[in-house]
Amino acid sequence: MNTRKHYKHCFAVAAYGESPYLPLLLHSLRMQSVESRVIICTSTPNRYITKLSAQFGYPVYVRNGAHGLQQDWNFAYEMGSERSELVTIAHQDDLYFPDYTKALLHAFQHFPDMSVFCCRYDTIDGEGNTIDGSSEKVKRILRLRLKDHAHADRTSVKLSALRYGNGIGCPSCTYHTKYCPAPLFRNDYKFVIDWDTLIRLAREPGRFICIEKPLMAYRVHAGAETMRNIENHNREKEEREVFRKLHSAPVTDVLMHFYKKAYGAYRAEDAGETGTTCS
């Protein structure tokens, strides 16, 4: 990669530990039909990450201090925003299809006031097999009003994708630094950190552009953060808190009744089975 070239877009890879999926992610970024800048950001430097950095030619930036989701994501975003005006925090478990950057830049060309870009995604298991991602099917329904790009700068339209659950897949998001200044993540949540952030951004100037075409793949597996948050009941606690910011207590209770059923569906997806989920 030509490090002196100016890129409008940067993939800031949030790397942690020694994930076996990290090389697959980096390869998917290398295979983009339109080149972007790629950097690797970590709070857990090790020989494995250094080796992959040398293999792919992507520089590594190290954050000093203990590992933490908010701190790591904010660091990746800040490093990316110093290099490009559009930043994607690439999750090490996931994959980006070859035309992700192409679609992103095309959307930005038509809507320069775009604050957040997102897209449909496929769901894959630990082996990379496409599985029934029931949660993404529900998210598509939540995102219906975002199809109207001409009015996607309205707060009501942006919030429509977030009011009854997070209809936007966090790994699919790219943020426009002009409208989304650092620090991007300003809450202390472990699971709904992205949902709460998107709600804040929906209330601020800027347009949410969603492309209803699979441009990436989200991986579910036993070691994923989502699974850990289900097992320790943190997901339920945090989702209830965010719903209460948007709805009355009775409405929140009804929504949580269905959301708790969704936790079992995530386990089913992880096992390669089918299920219905709302989150």
Predicted regions and their residues:
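Active-site acidic Asp-centered loop
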Residues: 43, 90-92, 118-120
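Conserved nucleotide-sugar donor-binding catalytic segment
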Residues: 144-235
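Glycine-rich, basic loop-to-helix element that forms the pyrophosphate-binding segment
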Residues: 64-82
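Conserved donor NDP-sugar-binding/catalytic core segment of glycosyltransferases
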Residues: 101-139
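A conserved acidic beta->alpha catalytic loop
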Residues: 41-50
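Short beta-strand-to-loop acidic/aromatic patch adjacent to the donor-nucleotide binding site
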Residues: 84-95
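Short, acidic, metal-binding catalytic loop of nucleotide-sugar glycosyltransferases
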Residues: 27-36
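N-proximal low-complexity "stem/linker" segments adjacent to membrane-targeting elements
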Residues: 1-28
